[in-house]
């Protein structure tokens, strides 16, 4: 959990309300345990999943896009499903935001969408650069981190990378294909294509079926 100053702070009173309404925001001593890691309200207000990415480039993605949709989905569940739900793990891996939960987010694909979007968001400042309408990002080698051009230049200047312009060009990635995923089953491909919403999330746009003869329907 980041100790940096949040871009989107929340009052202690509002945080406590969220913790009471959405208990999965509290840290647990161990996965599957109903015992909280912290005993007092003050400790839980300071240390919780809502504030997990405070000060990180993914804070907006986490607080303003992923979490509100998770709240809405959680509110739609029955009490039994709510009781089962918790975060199993939330972390950065290979430059992406990985979210593992005890209950699937189903067709909403919240965890997967957050992961896909995170790889095109600067992990340092939160910028989402585009060129000619396409998302673009600069990826470091070694410990993989996805950065905007400005933050990538700063990383190179700090000595994280040995060269400059050539290295910057080598780090650059441009997203030319839409977000989505493919399911393979019984010789047929099903492509689910997403479109971006006004608030920077993804939702299903259309589905393409590709049969054995490579024909799209």
Protein language model regions, located:
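Acidic, low-complexity, intrinsically disordered interaction modules
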Residues: 94-96, 174-204
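Short metal-coordination and nucleic-acid-contact micro-motifs, chiefly zinc-binding Cys/His arrays
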Residues: 117-121, 141-144
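Short functional micro-motifs and their immediate structural scaffolds
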Residues: 129-134, 156
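Short metal-binding segments enriched for Cys and/or His
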Residues: 152-164
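Long, charged N-terminal interaction/targeting segments
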Residues: 1-108, 179-187
